[in-house]
Regions:
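Conserved N-lobe ATP-binding subsite of Hanks-type protein kinase domains
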Residues: 54
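Conserved short submotifs of the Hanks-type protein kinase catalytic core
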Residues: 115-129
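Short beta-strand micro-motifs within the conserved protein kinase catalytic domain, predominantly
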Residues: 102-115
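Conserved catalytic-loop aspartate of Hanks-type protein kinases
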Residues: 226
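Activation segment signature within eukaryotic-like protein kinase domains
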Residues: 152-153
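Conserved N-lobe beta3->alphaC-helix segment of eukaryotic protein kinase catalytic domains
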Residues: 66, 71-95
């Protein structure tokens, strides 16, 4: 793992232990027997790599609980990675929601005079992300059931409602940032480019294919930008194809701004969606998703309006019954309280 100064303690190459002197943040929402920062961790396996660095599955040697460790190398020419990582830490440290990935702690490791490693220990989500699942279904020539998509939709909307209550826009909603537990519960992740809302913004940021027309046009935008990205995500879940394409960024942006959809998700005369696919879904569901990708943000439903749609409220009520939640569970926990309020609205 390289040379290390006194700002961290390495038992061996695959075991790490945060040093209390250089802890950046530790969540207050921890129910572990031991504080995160008092534990040593065994690296189990590499989960993924990216421009930000690497993500490992780690296990506490004391409690045997599993977590994800994101490592980002910070050098003078990669200060933007530090900005995004610190932004994610600052945002996640203030959040506590069952549909949002939880941050446990963050700490630094000094590698050499010019390089630091930023370490973020997070909740481990054990069943992959929606992008992986989309690719699997496409390979198997299968389609998602509407019931399953509705379950995911209301869970994500509950997380967005919580973010809105905390004045936060995610700004990068896409399948690869939506993770799944084995019980099919979703976890919204990657808050590196999220922001607190003090006023409408016009900064161009996000993943181009999922970015809203108002962001691309450098107009002011707010929470409805997340609704667009969520709508694009669900079009992709329905058709197993990207809704917007372009041989270059200019073409892609033009297609998004004018809602020129991928021809392969349209019917032959391009007057509507591919009927061979949408026949598997209710008109109410398709109409809702289509409304979410309205070019004018004022025409998109808000999170509360989505959650109060009859098709969503019915699915939430059935979800509660299918999972045998009693009234006390509904009332006494944060997540079920949200559902209880909404379906009683």
């Amino acid at each position: 793992m390289g040379a290390c100064t006194s700002t961290c303690f390495l038992v061996e190459d695959s075991i790490i232990k945060p040093n209390l002197n250089i802890i950046i943040m530790e969540s207050e929402n921890i129910n572990d027997d031991l504080k995160i920062t008092n534990q040593a961790y065994q690296k189990v396996k590499l989960l993924g790599t990216g421009s930000y660095g690497k993500v490992y599955l780690i296990k506490s040697l004391q409690t045997q609980k599993e977590y994800a460790l994101k490592e980002t190398l910070i050098t003078k020419n990669k200060e933007m990675f530090l900005y995004f990582s610190m932004n994610e830490i600052n945002i996640l440290s203030k959040l506590n929601n069952p549909y949002i990935i939880s941050l446990k702690c963050a700490f630094k490791t000094q590698i050499d005079e010019e390089t630091e490693k930023l370490n973020i220990i997070m909740e481990y989500v054990d069943n992959g992300d929606l992008n992986q699942l989309i690719n699997k279904y496409k390979d198997d020539e299968k389609f998602f059931e509407e019931k399953r998509l509705l379950n995911w939709l209301f869970q994500i909307c509950l997380s967005l409602l919580y973010l809105k209550e905390n004045e936060i826009i995610h700004r990068d909603i896409k399948p690869s940032n939506i993770f799944l537990l084995k019980d099919d519960t979703i976890k919204l992740a990657d808050f590196g480019i999220s922001k607190k809302v003090s006023k409408e913004d016009s900064m161009f940021i996000g993943t181009p294919v999922y970015t809203s027309p108002e962001i691309i046009s450098k107009k002011d935008y707010s929470y409805k930008a997340d609704i667009w990205s969520l709508g694009v995500t669900f079009l992709q879940l329905i058709f197993l194809r990207l809704p917007f394409l372009g041989e270059d960024h200019e073409t892609l942006y033009n297609n998004i701004i004018h809602k020129i959809l991928n021809p392969k998700i349209l019917n032959k005369d391009k007057t509507g969606y591919n009927e061979d696919i949408i026949k598997n879904y209710s008109k109410e569901f398709i109409d809702l998703i289509d409304k979410m990708v309205s070019v004018n943000p004022d025409d998109r439903p808000s999170v509360k309006e989505i959650l109060n749609k009859a098709i969503i409220k019915t699915r939430m009520e059935l979800y509660l019954k299918e999972n045998n939640f009693d009234e006390n569970e509904i009332i006494n926990t944060f997540y079920y309280l949200f559902i209880y309020i909404i379906i009683s609205y």
